[in-house]
């Protein structure tokens, strides 16, 4: 069967867009073909800085002929007195058939007319001419631009199109105003090594034809080549390459014909902190560092070499290396100067300069923010009941946590914030805990980052994030679906993750409330953002419980409450407890233990809402009047509820909810007898006092179960 090739040739694309575009095509192209009843034998996707391509192998020449059944109007509408009505005439005219070709069938909604149409399959080439422009124009991404004089947007101008149906050109035209790009079999080789046009003889020869023109169109093959070359060169240098995954991803889509080139720099530069050297190499120059090998290299000591991936002539490696060496030596010399100058003063001496750096126009300077971080840090220290030594270290960490922002090194290399703060703090004589806390208060910086291990880093990091979130919310700048310029979602996620990771028994709601009040005091024209903050944190909690801890959505709703302020407050006052309850619910669902109590609790809860018992009440002796009992089932129910109280309180205090579930399971027969046994009662008795007493029995059972979750939110398995 035939194969089809599409190549979109462009100016140099942003490196990250190549992978994004391929991923979008991988999602859309197979499904769009399936919608047209076209099933290929295989699809291969390609991309380089100058092209995006797809090779669809083994396509049928045309769609299969098929019979399509169409349902028409109801029979009593289609026919009157046995004759076709205008409704039927309109239907058959639209379907291209005659009234004689319809048939009447019984359905679950009565009799309807149906017609069967023979559909002749369309030619695949005709369908591709419709689909290909959609595949191109429906790509999405950041930083799209207009090109030509039309409205078509793409990351870079489109310069050529290749569309081959086996050996034949599939005529196609991409129109962008007055600019027209017509399809052909001509593509282009490597911009330097083979700039001439390349004629593709047939779709299946695409990859081989471009390999001969110094272009490897397969990102996977380029990745393998780059890794092999880097490792080989590093071995020749008697070292091992450091290959950051993000850098490798980027470099793969910066070159079409990769060639690894080694360079060196003066060993004296190795006196700089390793993080400085690697930042210069990886972030600014896209070089791969080389470190020493062997068991003696426990500190990952760097060697005075680097490896760069060239997209030029591999025979000019010495020239390429020399140019890159000049660049990195200049960058490292600058870094060496900054480092020496910064170390001439203690870190604390930089604090006054923070008053010259604006955090946010309405929120003051970074120095103002530091003051707020110090205050919130002490609130957290109060909650954790820390000793004076721990408080002192946290205070110092909070005071110095942003000081490195005004150093020359961090000004030039912002990626090193926190890293240099730790180095400079140690050089200034601060304790290791303070220095580590300065670095770790930024952690985690993303979804897959490491977590802070030091108490100083954990506490100050929480305080920093709380201040940012409360302050920005206070200004009304709440994140939307399309924008979160202050990364508040990430900050809230960091607060929850650090609290969970470090098992910190802190009351986030109290911190949010106090910080909100302090914000209003400082900005009397603003209102407290606390209600919006509650909703925001509950949303983040819900997302993390589902996505990170893999808790079913209904169980998440059960522990967070569905518009239930009681559950919202409880969750935000104890993040550890809400996590543990969610995980416990998931575990008893997985082993089906939840089924043993689900009906008992839910049946009770559904009736209990007709009463007025406070959902916090657990003690039967306060709300039940035994004198009103008429049946022994009420007496038994009352006794098991009395016995349940200490179990529930212990389960909640120790976060051992298995105790509660076991107890509820044992109560189930008693509750069943209350409803359906020989001594069953009518809960909604005509006597209002008896009715209230029975509703309170059910309400108490509901309340004990609510210590674990809102069972009404749980979907029955």
From Swiss-Prot:
EC number: 6.1.1.14
GO MF, one example: arginine-tRNA ligase activity
HAMAP family attached to this UniProt entry: Gly_tRNA_synth_beta
Complexes and interactors: Tetramer of two alpha and two beta subunits.
Family assignment from sequence similarity: Belongs to the class-II aminoacyl-tRNA synthetase family.
Gene Ontology annotations for the cellular component aspect, listed alphabetically: cytosol
Major location (coarse): cytoplasm
Pfam family, one: DALR_1
InterPro entries given in the database record: DALR_anticod-bd, Gly-tRNA-synth_bsu, Gly-tRNA-synth_heterodimer
Organism: Gloeothece citriformis (strain PCC 7424)
Keywords carried by this UniProt record: Aminoacyl-tRNA synthetase, ATP-binding, Cytoplasm, Ligase, Nucleotide-binding, Protein biosynthesis
Enzymatic reactions: tRNA(Gly) + glycine + ATP = glycyl-tRNA(Gly) + AMP + diphosphate
Compartments reported by the entry: Cytoplasm
Protein name in UniProt: Glycine--tRNA ligase beta subunit
């Amino acid at each position: 069967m035939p194969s089809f090739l599409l190549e979109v040739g462009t100016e140099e694309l942003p490196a990250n867009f190549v992978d994004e575009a391929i991923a979008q095509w991988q999602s859309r192209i197979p499904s769009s073909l399936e919608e047209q009843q076209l099933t290929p034998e295989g699809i291969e996707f390609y991309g380089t800085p100058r092209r995006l391509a797809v090779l669809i192998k083994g396509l049928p020449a045309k769609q299969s002929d098929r019979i399509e059944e169409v349902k028409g109007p109801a029979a009593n509408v289609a026919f009157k007195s046995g004759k076709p009505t205008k409704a039927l005439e309109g239907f058959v005219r639209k379907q291209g058939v005659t009234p004689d070709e319809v048939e009447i069938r019984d359905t679950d909604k009565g009799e309807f007319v149906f017609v069967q149409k023979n559909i002749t399959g369309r030619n695949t080439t005709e369908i591709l001419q419709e689909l290909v422009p959609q595949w191109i124009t429906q790509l999405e991404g950041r930083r799209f631009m207009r090109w030509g004089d039309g409205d078509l947007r793409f990351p870079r101008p489109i310069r050529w199109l290749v569309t081959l149906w086996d050996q034949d050109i599939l005529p196609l035209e991409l129109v962008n105003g007055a600019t027209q790009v017509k399809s052909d079999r001509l593509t282009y080789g490597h911009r330097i090594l083979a700039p001439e046009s390349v004629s593709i003889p047939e779709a299946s020869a695409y990859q081989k034809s471009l390999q001969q023109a110094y272009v490897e169109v397969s990102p996977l093959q380029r990745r393998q080549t780059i890794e092999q070359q880097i490792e080989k060169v590093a071995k020749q240098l008697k070292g091992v390459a450091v290959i950051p995954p993000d850098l490798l991803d980027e470099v793969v889509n910066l070159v079409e014909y990769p060639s690894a080139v080694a360079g060196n720099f003066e060993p004296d530069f190795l006196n700089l902190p390793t993080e400085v050297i690697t930042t210069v190499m990886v972030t600014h120059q896209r070089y791969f560092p080389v470190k020493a090998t062997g068991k003696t290299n426990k500190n990952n000591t760097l060697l005075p070499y680097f490896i760069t991936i060239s997209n030029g002539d591999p025979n000019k490696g010495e020239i390429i290396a020399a140019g890159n060496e000049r660049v990195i030596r200049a960058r490292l010399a600058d870094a060496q100067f900054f480092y020496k100058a910064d170390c001439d003063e203690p870190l604390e001496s930089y604090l006054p300069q923070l008053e010259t750096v604006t955090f946010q126009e309405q929120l003051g300077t970074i120095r103002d923010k530091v003051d707020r971080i110090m205050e919130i840090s002490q609130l957290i220290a109060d909650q954790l009941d820390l000793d004076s030594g721990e408080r002192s270290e946290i205070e110092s960490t909070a005071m110095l946590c942003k000081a490195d922002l005004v150093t020359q090194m961090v000004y030039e290399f912002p990626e090193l914030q926190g890293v240099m703060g730790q180095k400079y703090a140690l050089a200034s004589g601060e304790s290791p805990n303070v220095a580590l806390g300065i670095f770790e208060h930024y952690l985690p910086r993303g979804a897959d980052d490491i977590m802070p291990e030091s108490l100083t880093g954990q506490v100050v990091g929480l305080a920093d994030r709380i201040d940012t979130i409360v302050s920005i919310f206070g200004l009304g700048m709440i994140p939307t679906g399309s924008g979160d310029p202050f990364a508040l979602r990430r900050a809230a996620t960091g607060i929850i993750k650090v609290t969970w990771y470090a098992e910190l028994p802190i009351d986030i709601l109290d911190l949010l409330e106090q910080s909100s009040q302090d914000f209003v005091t400082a900005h009397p024209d603003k209102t407290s953002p606390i209600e919006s903050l509650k909703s925001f944190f509950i949303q983040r909690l819900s997302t993390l419980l589902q996505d990170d801890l893999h808790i079913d959505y209904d169980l998440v709703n059960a522990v967070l409450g569905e518009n239930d302020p009681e559950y919202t407050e409880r969750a935000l006052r104890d993040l550890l407890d809400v996590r543990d309850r969610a995980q416990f619910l998931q575990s008893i669902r997985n082993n089906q233990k939840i089924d043993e109590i689900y009906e008992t609790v839910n049946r009770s809860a559904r009736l209990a809402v007709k009463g007025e018992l406070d959902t916090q009440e657990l003690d039967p002796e306060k709300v039940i009047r035994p004198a009103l009992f008429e049946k022994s089932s009420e007496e038994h129910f009352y006794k098991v509820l009395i016995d349940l109280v200490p179990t529930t309180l212990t389960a909640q205090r120790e976060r051992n909810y298995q105790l509660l579930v076991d107890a509820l399971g044992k109560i189930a027969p008693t509750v069943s007898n209350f409803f359906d046994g020989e001594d069953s009662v009518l809960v909604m008795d005509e006597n209002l006092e008896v009715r209230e007493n029975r509703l309170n029995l059910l309400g108490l059972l509901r309340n004990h179960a609510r210590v674990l979750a809102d069972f009404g939110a749980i979907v029955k398995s």
